[in-house]
Swiss-Prot record:
Stretches for region G3: 309-312
PANTHER family: TR-TYPE G DOMAIN-CONTAINING PROTEIN (PTHR43381:SF5), TRANSLATION INITIATION FACTOR IF-2-RELATED (PTHR43381)
tr-type G domain mapped to chain residues: 250-423
GO molecular function: GTP binding; GTPase activity; translation initiation factor activity
Designated name of the protein: Translation initiation factor IF-2, chloroplastic
UniProt entry tagged with the keyword NADP: no
The organism of origin for this protein: Rhodomonas salina
Length: 751
């Protein structure tokens, strides 16, 4: 074979070795084509003087192979470097303390809380306050998305839970999920879900809980949960008090009357206003915030005062809290014949937390068993020390019923208001707070507002949370229609798109476009912080073996504050056998829609200080829907408790009969019998027993049979021995304690 292969410079052919030639002549064979090449165009590929690269075009595969070889070379270099680094890291050098190490030091008990000598230290949680657990919502949301690849077994999780210690106080920044709350409270998610389930709230592990719901869970578990609000929210609320100093004018004081139920708050206000409000109130108790303006003569001048009469009943804590937040002076009413009570203490805490000046009115001094000095002594426990005892708290003994010392009390109020130097700017747009809201048959959604700065006028475009209004009308506390409202004055307005939430701040905008933007922002914020307690839960599938039934409720009230109070009171009913589920609670009259939904869901409709709309009463009778109407919150709560008792059956008081100790365990067929020695009292065959092991009740039930040798006996007395068989329990152990009781049925309340 001739080594000299001739090719054309224009056309190339593919050789047996990896060279690719581009050829135009596709139908001509290689041999024929080579013979047609002119002599001067032939090239000797094996001639060392010829640069064959000028004529050769590399194949694409060749290019890829070259690049692959280059990458392989680079990878080999990198691997070599990594190996050298690993070798350097793996070197172990003994130091002078090496010989003192012991194998036992590196062994630890199983569990996440065990101390591992070489474990990475835990990163401390952010925003910790003293010894309390704190949760920053943003941080937790991020961290909660990281899932561990290894799933902990149920046994290990239980061990972890036992090792954790529940905190006494926890601080949260806002709404959070069930899972996040469980981490903070060091409890299982199941425990939180069960607690809410029994209150009628079905949740999942990732569902968001609002602050009030989280606090309710904390109360059930004996953990105090504090809410630290974001700085942005706080600064927004403080904008109300940012006033142009050059345009300031004196304004009337806002005075909140607070104290325990039946201590005479409304009677005191009646005496000041010279009215008879107390006689008109259902059950003799205030059940909503009453806002009133009063003009009194003082030193040849007419002074205007604004009073807020807050409810004293336990259920209305939310209203009391709102009342003190907008007040300038607080009057704490304490009955001289009754003393300091739970709601008195709660009111003191609200007042002191708001840093509001306080005047104590010791009422009912005309009663025979009145003890003014004892009241003063009780109040010193809460850092309220009278001036004549060396303190700085103003205390005025009065009789609201007879009008004793009323002038002294009013003089003190005016004196304190002058010291406080209360001012506002009437030339700016109005700002203030929503005290209450309800639905009116003719006006629609109406709200009672307290103007705190600026001037409110008919036609103003107002927003309060997600509610918006072009004010169509205003009525003052005397029931008179007015065109404008000045600072420190309460006013009833209508023209609202929907009911605003009580306690919401309101502000005025120049046009509807700006107002709609503000409402849209509030709606977006509400989507994130939406409370699950006010929505119908679809999570009805959670089962609990201890739950004996479900009560579905639809609650309609006169105002939103009453609905809030009723829901809060229902959640505090001490029971864990029945799930009380509030499907929804709202202000307004009962409609046919409410009746239809109650029929579908099997709910009881509770009406509080409201009535049935036209057609609703007929629909309720036709569909056999139970509707209960109340005007006193005590009666409404009593009805719910009685309904719970009907489901759970009779409740019993336990009367101790005797105690015995297990001295031996004997087999009987497929079960076991406990051999007892009675140490106290007696054990009767009909007794209810508890089996106690290491201070824990391992069985609670009744006796199947009681024997002495082989004979049935009715009872075994102290220092005697007997055999005890319980069909439902056979895991006896020596030294178990058997406590016997007689069950005495509790008396039922009458409906």
């Amino acid at each position: 074979m001739n080594n000299n292969i001739a090719i054309s410079k224009e056309n190339t052919i593919k050789l047996s070795f990896p060279l690719v030639f581009d050829t135009k002549t596709t139908n001509t064979s290689t041999k024929e084509y080579v013979e047609t090449i002119k002599e001067d165009e032939k090239v000797d590929l094996f001639d060392p003087t010829i640069d064959t690269k000028l004529f050769v075009k590399p194949d694409r595969k060749t290019k890829k192979n070259d690049k692959s070889d280059q990458r392989d070379s680079d990878i080999d270099i990198i691997k070599t470097k990594l190996k050298s680094k690993k070798k350097e890291k793996s070197k172990f050098r003994k130091d002078e303390d090496y010989d003192s190490l012991k194998r036992e030091d590196n062994q630890s008990p199983q569990g996440a809380m065990s101390s591992l000598p070489f474990a990475r230290p835990e990163v401390p949680a952010k925003k910790m306050v003293s010894n309390t657990n704190t949760l920053n919502k943003k941080n937790v949301v991020k961290s909660s998305t990281k899932k561990s690849k290894k799933q902990t077994s149920a046994k290990n999780r239980e061990l972890e839970q036992n090792l954790l210690v529940k905190p006494e106080n926890v601080v949260i920044a806002g709404p959070l999920s069930v899972q996040e709350l469980a981490v903070l409270l060091t409890v299982s998610e199941t425990e939180i879900i069960r607690s809410l389930f029994l209150k009628g709230i079905g949740v999942t592990i990732n569902q968001i809980l609002d602050v009030s719901t989280a606090k309710t869970v904390g109360e059930d578990l004996g953990i105090n949960i504090d809410h630290v609000k974001d700085s942005d929210e706080e600064s927004k609320k403080l904008q109300i008090h940012e006033i142009d100093n050059e345009s300031l004018e004196k304004r009337p004081p806002v005075i909140a009357i607070m104290g325990h139920v039946d201590h005479g708050k409304t009677t005191l206000l009646d005496k000041i206003r010279k009215t008879q409000i107390a006689q008109k109130e259902a059950g003799g108790i205030t059940q909503k915030i009453g806002a009133y303006e009063v003009e009194i003569d003082y030193k040849d001048q007419t002074k205007k005062l604004t009073f807020l009469d807050t409810p004293g009943h336990e259920a209305f804590s939310g209203m009391r809290s709102r009342g003190v937040q907008v007040t300038d002076i607080a009057i704490l009413v304490v009955a001289a014949d009754d003393g300091v009570k739970p709601q008195t203490v709660e009111a003191i805490k609200y007042i002191q937390a708001a840093n509001v000046p306080i005047i104590v009115a010791i009422n009912k001094i005309d009663k025979e068993n009145a003890d003014i000095e004892n009241i003063k002594q009780q109040l010193t426990q809460y850092n309220l020390i009278p001036e004549n005892w060396g303190g700085d708290t103003l205390m005025v003994p009065i009789s609201a019923m007879k009008g004793t010392n009323m002038e002294n009390l009013l003089e003190m109020i005016i004196l304190v208001s002058e010291i406080e130097d209360l001012k506002a700017n009437t030339k700016v747009k109005a700002q203030g707070t929503v005290l209450e809201a309800h639905l009116d048959r003719t006006k629609g959604a109406v709200a009672t507002l307290l103007v705190q700065n600026g001037t409110l006028r008919i036609g103003d475009i107002l927003t309060a949370g997600t509610s918006m209004a072009k004010i169509r009308g205003m009525i003052n506390s005397l029931g008179e229609k007015i065109e404008e409202c000045l600072p420190s004055s309460p006013v009833l307005i209508w023209g609202l798109s929907k009911l605003p939430a009580s306690g919401e701040h309101f502000e005025i905008f120049d046009d509807e476009k700006q107002a709609k933007i503000a409402v849209q922002k509030a709606q977006e914020a509400n989507k994130e912080n939406q409370t699950i307690a006010n929505t119908i839960s679809e999570n009805y599938t959670l089962s609990n073996s201890n739950t004996k039934g479900v009560i579905n409720l639809i609650i309609k009230t006169d105002i939103q504050g009453s609905a809030e109070a009723i829901i809060g009171s229902i959640n505090k009913i001490p029971q864990d056998k029945v799930q009380v589920r509030v499907l929804y609670a709202s202000a307004g009259e009962i409609t046919e829609t409410d009746i239809d939904f109650a029929d579908t869901s099997g709910a009881i409709v509770l009406a509080f200080n409201t009535s049935l709309a036209t057609g609703a009463s007929k629909a309720a009778r036709h569909l056999n829907v139970k509707v209960k109407e109340y005007d006193v919150i005590y009666d409404l709560l009593d009805y719910i408790e009685l309904t719970i008792e009907e489901i759970t059956g009779p409740e019993y008081d336990k009367k101790s009969l005797g105690k015995a100790i297990v001295q031996g365990v004997f087999p009987l067929a497929k079960s076991f019998v406990a051999g007892l020695r009675v140490t106290e009292g007696k054990i009767t065959k009909n007794a209810h027993i508890e089996v106690i092991r290491q201070d824990l009740v391992v069985f609670d039930g009744s006796i199947t049979s009681l024997k002495k040798v082989k004979e049935d006996i009715g009872e075994a007395i102290e220092d005697s021995e007997c055999g005890l068989f319980v069909e439902e329990f056979d895991t006896w152990q020596e030294n178990d304690i058997v406590q016997a009781f007689e069950l005495i049925p509790k008396k039922r309340k009458e409906k």
